[in-house]
Curated annotation (Swiss-Prot):
Source organism of this protein record: Mus musculus
Name assigned to this protein: EKC/KEOPS complex subunit GON7
Keyword ATP-binding assigned: no
Region (Disordered) location: 55-98
TM segment ranges: none
Acidic residues composition-biased segments: 61-79
Top-rank taxon: Eukaryota
Assembly and oligomerization: Component of the EKC/KEOPS complex composed of at least GON7, TP53RK, TPRKB, OSGEP and LAGE3; the whole complex dimerizes.
GO BP annotation list: tRNA threonylcarbamoyladenosine modification
Location relative to the cell: Nucleus
Taxonomic lineage of the native organism: Eukaryota, Metazoa, Chordata, Craniata, Vertebrata
Gene, per the UniProt record: Gon7
Amino acid sequence: MELSGEYVGCDGEPQRLRVSCEASGDADPLQSLSAGVVRMKELVAEFFGTLVEQDAQGLAEDPDDALDGDDEDDAEDENNSGRTNSDGPSAKRPKPAS
């Protein structure tokens, strides 16, 4: 038995994480699976911790770039503050059939 996960970053490159959950001998398969889940959780935390550190270093190198990207969204949000949201379902209740 194996647990696997895949992360596709902004660059489009997939990163695979795999953990074997094989029960050895008389070991309970559920205990092996549980141990595999714990190992996978640790791998995921380590993997994303590394990505967060890399991202933080990128922001620390040029903090002005991080601030510049938000200006367009803020202006757009201000322009749309009085409009209704047309992306979701209608808030009106349907009329009951007579």
